[in-house]
């Protein structure tokens, strides 16, 4: 029996009306403009565009050096002690329940003990909030600061998630420069010039992603004094504090919390090479209690109350992970990164259109300046990376993704052989696109480019 033969549309569902329903003007809902604006400044959007230019050529396999995740390479695997800490909790059954929004107390105590090793003004467990990775810490703190007309000062270049979340939270973004000629120090006069009565905070990243520098005690003190003068807090991202392979010691911004309130963001993803475990923290460095009296502590707690809490299994393992001596793990990782920096800088000497004036001392990236006048048919850093992906199946990150036009970021947190292959392809690409005119070579030899 054909059931459709007796089917009759109700009188109010005419054919014309059915067609009209495809007209979106009759519907009252729309996708979020905030999400569209925020995602437009994320690094992923650019990386996806670059991947779209790549091919499946098995003779020249894809080399993804645009984003950093050393954990995918066996040589960077975390230590067995760290893994066993989680395994022991898993087998005990003690990590199977929900936890408080701020994190379980043993985890908060472990983080407090860990950060206090380098602090004069100690933090208490109640000053610590456990988050789903450092990224959720960024989101919670920025959302807690958001109010009508408020603006926040972000570094340029920077980790793009700060701008994306500020935009999503309705904060106006103002960018201050990091100065390459001064080893990427913060332009403090520039900060004073752009701040106004609606400025609520400034963000610093130390050790710095993507520049790879480590700020000195004196410079950080000046940062704190500038923040105090402006009446703003300092948000400091210190997730790379265990990824330092240069000579400069790490100084936590919390050392200057007696000058201005400091909110420290951290996590185990970079130091312990376990980004997939998604454990980070917010630590409040504020001996004078300003964050509490201004409502920031309450706002952070309230924002955590409406977000998912971090996995209890890894939280319960934090006392073991942070309490153990991890010197061997850190030393091995940092030694490999330092060797990779030397490798890249040595090979870049053969590529005149890419220059690294300052070797990174930390993190898993290397920034190199693109000398466009030496190249033909290359418009800018984005064009360079798009054509490189298409011709060489090599993905590097254009500086524009970080707020630094005509620079290139190379990920060094990979296996050395991959870097060797990538640099060989990069050299070949640059040679093909190098201008053959005598004037360009003359300018290069005279140091004018």
From Swiss-Prot:
Biased composition (Polar residues): 1-12
EC number: 2.6.1.-
CDD domains in alphabetical order: AAT_like
UniProt keyword terms in alphabetical order: Aminotransferase, Pyridoxal phosphate, Transferase
Example GO BP: biosynthetic process
Highest taxon of the lineage: Eukaryota
GO molecular function: pyridoxal phosphate binding; transaminase activity
Pfam families named in the record: Aminotran_1_2
Region: Disordered, residue numbers: 1-20
Catalytic EC class: transferase
Family to which this protein belongs: Belongs to the class-I pyridoxal-phosphate-dependent aminotransferase family.
Stated name of the protein: Probable aminotransferase TAT1
Source organism per UniProt: Arabidopsis thaliana (Mouse-ear cress)
